[in-house]
Amino acid sequence: MNTSHKTLKTIAILGQPNVGKSSLFNRLARERIAITSDFAGTTRDINKRKIALNGHEVELLDTGGMAKDALLSKEIKALNLKAAQMSDLILYVVDGKSIPSDEDLKLFREVFKTNPNCFLVINKIDNDKEKERSYAFSSFGTPKSFNISVSHNRGISALIDAVLNALNLNQIIEQDLDADILESLETPNNALEETKEEEIIQVGIIGRVNVGKSSLLNALTKKERSLVSSVAGTTIDPIDETILIGDQKICFVDTAGIRHRGKILGIEKYALDRTQKALEKSHIALLVLDVSAPFVELDEKISSLADKHSLGIILILNKWDIRYAPYEEIMATLKRKFRFLEYAPVITTSCLKARHIDEIKHKIIEVYECFSKRIPTSSLNSVIFQATQKHPLPSDGGKLVKVYYATQFATKPPQISLIMNRPKALHFSYKRYLINTLRKEFNFLGTPLILNAKDKKSVQQN
């Protein structure tokens, strides 16, 4: 190992919560040190570790997430910026499966202003087809960006090489490759395995404890694969089972039930972390709701997980045979409480009696087709043009607002860029109008549709 440098080079991993900072820290450190979870703000303190990158000893810092609304956010942000100032290199991690927010861009610019020796690391780019997702981050304006997937170990070697070059630690060191290093290398076999995985629809079953998730899994697979009990929280680890419908493979993941945060202790915290990991790899969520009693606030919070992970979603109303109210009342309440999921199909069932199970299976395939849909550019622009003609864009301070053209740059979920002269003038209500128009024309059943306004000049520059 090279120890010729008396002062170790320091690398800080920064970014908003839930983007994979701690997972990257663990990957680079080659052991599980930081607690990783998909709940925003898991890392509160700065984790410091001496590690070896290709034989070079460096100091790695994993920082708390910099979310604006996080508890202790001001203190965490100040600590982050101090770490950035003291570091030789910053790895600013973003979630490649999401559209960058104004807050994302603002935080990155603050960090970059503090220390320009900064790499933009776009995580969760799990395969070649998802590379187009990284285009959404072109507005960050940095030439030093890297597409990686920590969970699939993609792009990590290239990132390490770039880090060593930036720190002037790029001399070749002769050393024996141990088993861990060999195991971490990206190989064509890994790529082939990922291609096979893409052919399987990944479905996460989510809901509160004891709403019937395990019973639903058993009914879907016709197996007693998941332990069913009246004791809340029977399922601890996610349990998966693959079935075949025609030529289509569907992998179901029965996740641990989620209860109020204040009651999460010990092994349930572990179970909740595993649930979040399972959802990150899912395409579609089956949100199971118990209609033997009125909906509760936690049902709404859990439903936001599908939105958070940009998943397709199907609402499953379980225990319909013992529902607490008439059909009309339940549907009216559902529409009111889950208004943001108005595009999701609703299926009533009794999992123990296996009612409407085939309908659920076929609806999964239908939603997945919508989730994977790509609209021809000519058709997309025709609909956008007609919509803007029918209801013109409001002016911005007396100045005309134009949409030059639209392009779909990603699927799973569908993501569309509107190339405009004044993108910041696109009001959320008008964006909602365009999304509703696209849903009506192209059928995005159960599928989130992401619309992203971009400046024409920035697109031309990139």
Swiss-Prot record:
Binding site residues for GTP 1: 15-22, 62-66, 123-126
Q: Name one GO molecular function term.
A: ribosome binding
Location of the KH-like domain: 373-457
Point out the signal peptide segment.
Answer: none
> Which organism does this sequence originate in?
Helicobacter pylori (strain J99 / ATCC 700824) (Campylobacter pylori J99)
Identify the residues that the record assigns to the EngA-type G domain, covering every copy.
Answer: 9-171, 201-372
- Give the GO terms filed under biological process for this record: ribosome biogenesis
What is the name attached to this protein's record?
A: GTPase Der
Positions contributing to GTP 2 binding: 207-214, 254-258, 318-321
